[in-house]
Regions:
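Inter-lobe coupling/hinge segments of SF2-like helicase ATPases
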Residues: 1, 5-6, 10-211
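C-terminal or mid-to-C-terminal helical accessory/interaction module adjacent to the motor/catalytic core
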Residues: 215-220
């Protein structure tokens, strides 16, 4: 059969060469690109009228904006954020993006929040093991998922409505936007905590990114 259309989800994950390879499969193929964070080339072509584009600005019914906090990393803040979610029967993503120290962070969280049932997920795990952990988290056998950025895409857990991101100053604006989008996928109020070093040792550019993601929390 002939290819008549192509759908590209998450434009930012595909480079120009990759897209051209897909288009060469069939010259007259129709291309539909879906993205919340378009790459500059795609955005520019749309704004200049080279490509048609539509904006979906209406949030799903009963969806609430994620409340976003930028704060220095403190044990008290972490415990309060986790417990608030657990007390309403919800789940938490705790993002620690250094696999070699993730078990140390697990031990710290177990001491800090002994009430939590913690699972670990990262990209260096065997595929079957990772699938098992994610399935158990979805089924609420665990209420805190200590993870890497592996959760950035393809994860939809409506009962997970708090995300805590360590060293948020190290992430780009688009990535922070994607990570924050893992929560707030139901009618419950969701929270995102972007943690920075307690000593304030991060760049001015990082501060600008954090200020921007905190300011741009409205839906649509």
């Amino acid at each position: 059969s002939l290819v008549g259309s192509e759908m590209c989800i998450r434009d930012s994950r595909f480079g120009v060469r990759q897209k051209e390879v897909l288009r060469k499969i069939r010259a007259e193929v129709d291309v539909l690109t879906l993205t919340a964070t378009p790459i500059p080339r795609t955005l520019s072509m749309s704004l200049e009228g080279i490509r048609d584009f539509s904006v979906i600005a209406t949030a799903p019914e009963r969806r609430l904006a994620v409340k976003t906090f930028v704060t220095s990393e403190q044990d008290g803040t972490i415990r309060e954020a986790v417990l608030r979610e657990l007390k309403r029967g919800g789940q938490v993503y705790y993002l620690h993006n250094e696999v070699n120290t993730i078990e140390n962070t697990r031990a710290r969280l177990e001491t800090l929040v002994p009430e939590a049932r913690i699972a670990v997920a990262h990209g260096q795990m065997r595929e079957r093991e990772l699938e098992h952990v994610m399935r158990d988290f979805y089924q609420q056998r665990f209420n805190v998922l200590l993870c890497s950025t592996i959760i950035e895409t393809g994860i939809d857990v409506p009962s997970a409505n708090t995300i805590i991101i360590e060293r948020a100053d190290k992430f780009g604006l688009a990535q922070l936007h994607q990570l924050r989008g893992r929560v707030g996928r139901s009618h419950h109020q969701a929270y995102a905590y972007l943690l920075t070093p307690p000593d304030g040792a991060f760049t001015k550019d990082a501060q600008k990114r954090l200020d921007a993601i905190q300011a741009l929390e409205d839906l649509g």
